[in-house]
Amino acid sequence: MSALVDQLVAQVIGLEVGLLSCQARLAAVTDDEALHDLRTTVRRLRSLLRPLRGLPGVEQLELAASSVGQLTTPLRDREVLAAYLHQHGYHEAASRRLRLQPEAYRQVAQSPELAHLLLILDAFPRFIRASEHQKLLKGLRPRIQKRLAKQWQKLDEALKDPDHDRHRLRLLIKRVRYAAEAYPELDKLPANAMSRLKKAQGALGDWHDCWQWLAQAEHQADLQPCVAVWHRTMAKAEGQADRVLDRLSADCF
């Protein structure tokens, strides 16, 4: 048990260091990957926490991480859209969006949401150690394994549903994949599962981008020239996603 707790504490401290680095990069607007790296780090934290629900401090930390995720989602979406627009020659539309980013980066760095997350995260290793001392972590390893297996079962059921919802499938795939990365020694997935999950997530991500951009185009006039292409790309992505999901289901379940 002590080894597992040591690993948890080490991961939490590493994630805290990563977040502090991202915060400094955002505050100084050093590069355009800082926001993405911040979100990736928060995602890794949430994946680490999900199987630990019920332990002291976990709920508060999950809520704080979720708040940072909600704060930064529209900013990251704008980044991704601007990159697409630049790539396809719509430079003016891209620039209009990118001009907003530097100030947005600074606001995220100074936000109460990020400050609150860092405050709770700094104290969390002490919560884990105190829980261990009070014998609250008995059975932690099988509990984590049981919750990881339950996530895998949920994905299996969703894949077998003929009326599956792509949004929910995308979320379930991300949860399973990131949990496996957080607990590689505890998550007993089939040998080729990670590569299949990554491909499925990518295919659903392409579909989701088009779906989201088409929704934005309804009230952003400068996106209208892209609408026809997005409809075609979305239809193609749906077919690709279905094929990849069928392969995931056949190979891994």
Q: What are these model-predicted stretches?
A:
Residues 1-253:
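Function-determining surface determinants
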